């Protein structure tokens, strides 16, 4: 029986999950919920099911795999990654995976908070000034490695790819000073399963955010 991944009909928090499911050739189906237009932003599609799915902490995204029902995006990622030994093989690799996992969430949340802020246009110039330092830290952490944890693909690569790609969409030149990050994105997109998935109609690059956001909302 295929796994069921539930989320809004946007890229949001689930792009790394979708990419990991594709990379691992996992059998899954998507349950996509649609949010209504502003100002009401009707969420009844999700709210009508929210407490009927047997989730301990009902939220989106969720993953249902037989008797296993999981919420929280990173918990879902780790569940899939453990099945395929993608959490790092050595202690050093596992430490690097943990660091990037949490750093990527911080970096992602900073962009989310800006894009859902009513003062988006006013705050955007200051936010743009902070991007080079953010990207510099990722570049230095990656160094000359092909992947963030080392020589092999791990779950943190899916998170790093997604957040770096979002920032590049937000500020197209932000990775120009960091060729190793641009090479990393190209290397990731060149993975056979990933490349094939990105050519399908199922791949959702945008919108990144819901209709309530000030950027990438359609």
Curated annotation (Swiss-Prot):
Stretch forming the signal peptide: none
One GO-annotated biological process of the protein: glutathione metabolic process
Residue sites binding substrate per the record: 116
PROSITE patterns: GST_CTER, GST_NTER
Enzyme class of the recorded protein, top EC level: transferase
Function: Conjugation of reduced glutathione to a wide number of exogenous and endogenous hydrophobic electrophiles.
Name of the featured protein: Glutathione S-transferase Y1
UniProt source species: Cricetulus longicaudatus (Long-tailed dwarf hamster)
